[in-house]
Each structure stands twice: as C-alpha cells, then as structure tokens.
C-alpha cells in the first residue's frame, strides 16, 4: 500500500528537476500522475518540446506506475482547465496539485526590463493562481484536496538579481495562506515548500566571482539532490497530512524546517503618538535591536553541513 493509493495528481513543470522527482515518487506511492511540462527553456523561451514530460511518463510506466503527459502552459487558464479535465478523463478524478513550474530571468532591479518582470510573474504567481483556481471547485465539491505550492528563500529572505522571482515567490506564500484559510472546512489543505536543490534553474544562477564563495555554492548544490525534496511532497499530498495546513516548509538535503508567519518582533508605544523627531530619538533605536540582517538569508541558512 502506497501513501497515495487511489489518488490522482497534476504536477506542473515536472519534466525536469524537483517536479520530475516528485511526480515519480508520487507514482511509486500509488498516485496516477498528469506530468505537465510545456518544454520551454529555463527562461521561458521556445515551446513544444514534448521530450521532458514524455520521458518522465515513460520512466513512471516502466516502474509499474500510471502517468500521462500534458504540454500546456500554466500561464494560460484554459490550459490549466484542460489539465484538470485530462486528469478526470484519463484517471477518473483529481485530488492533488503540485506547482513547481518555473523560469528565471535574473537581473538587478535597475536593469530589469518590464517583459522579464512580467514573464516571471506570469509563470510563478499567475501560474499558481491558474492551475489551483482550475482545480479548487472540484476539490470543494468532493470535500478533499491537497495543494502544494512552491516558493523560495529568494522570496522569504531576498536574493540579489531576483526581484521578479522573489516578488512572485513571496506572493505565493500569501496566496497559499489565504487558500488554506478559505478551504480548510472543505477537507482541503494548502501548504508551501521552499526547496533548495540542484536543478536546471539553480544552475542558471551566476556563480560567485569569489573562489571561496563559488566553491561553497558548488558543494551546497552537490549535496542538494532534487530527489531529496520528493518525500515531503508525497507526505503533504497524503491523508496523513490532513492536519497540516497553511504552513511553509524549507528543505535542503537532510534538513527540514518550518517557517513562522509574519508577526511583530518588537513594539514600542508612546502616549500622544509620535513625531518624526521622537521616532528618530526613541522609536527607531528601540526597534532596531530586532531588525533583520540584510544578508540575503545567510544568517538564517548558514550553509553546511546539510546531511
């Protein structure tokens, strides 16, 4: 008996990387899987390469599982409706949506072109809306659904050159929280994973010029296997995770952590209110001891060891 016996999953962008590993492990645990991948490049360029999705489908079938390929784009709502319908027509229903589809177009903010901003927002944030909006009413009607959204520490903590990606990924956290709140009474859970893994996307990020930093990055990537992320996703997609809802998880190799939601770290009060001068003299010095370091998350995720 697998944890997902009798369940049907749609996995977007799953011809490569984390998505491919999750699709395969879901199938190994009994799920029937719609493997979606439009076959575009790492920046969203091109289209129509059916090889990535079909290859994962073939691997699943060779291992004794059930899967079908889908080549639609998460940027198009009609394509997402078609994914849901394909799951129902082929396998008789839908219970799980996993959302790793993504691209990168990294540039510093002052060099970011509007089209690069919009392309990344469309795939990540709008893509999450499209595929989950296409599935949510079915989930509500049947009183069961598992949604696993994909964010990133670039959104939670910030990262140089990724203002478009980070903005989309933090937006996904807010979207997931609201979807979880609105649908908890309907037997639906919605959680977020922030995976750190060696994939085509992470390899496209420029290597640091400093040799020490470059070597550390390479070692982190070497240890961050994409298949290490899959067990968490299978668990979150299962009935055993029915009481896990609205949470944000980070996983990297053997490390598994949960993030807290935004809340005040420190508060100061002044009778009669504040003036710019009293904020400068009293308010800000008192609050500053709780400031978050502007270090791209290094103080939160210091690095090795990870195993």
Residue ranges: model-predicted function:
Residues 132, 168, 176:
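Active-site helix of classical SDR
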Residues 152:
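Residue(s) in the substrate-gating loop at a strand-loop-helix junction
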Residues 5, 63-68, 86-99, 105-108, ...:
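A glycine-rich helix->loop->beta "capping" turn
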Residues 2-35, 40:
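Canonical Rossmann dinucleotide-binding motif of NAD(H)/NADP(H)-dependent dehydrogenases/reductases
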Residues 50, 54, 71-85, 114:
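The beta1-alpha1 cofactor-binding region of Rossmann-like NAD(H)/NADP(H)-dependent oxidoreductases
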Residues 60, 108-109, 116-121:
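Substrate-binding pocket helix/loop in short-chain dehydrogenase/reductase
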Residues 213-307:
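C-terminal helical subdomain
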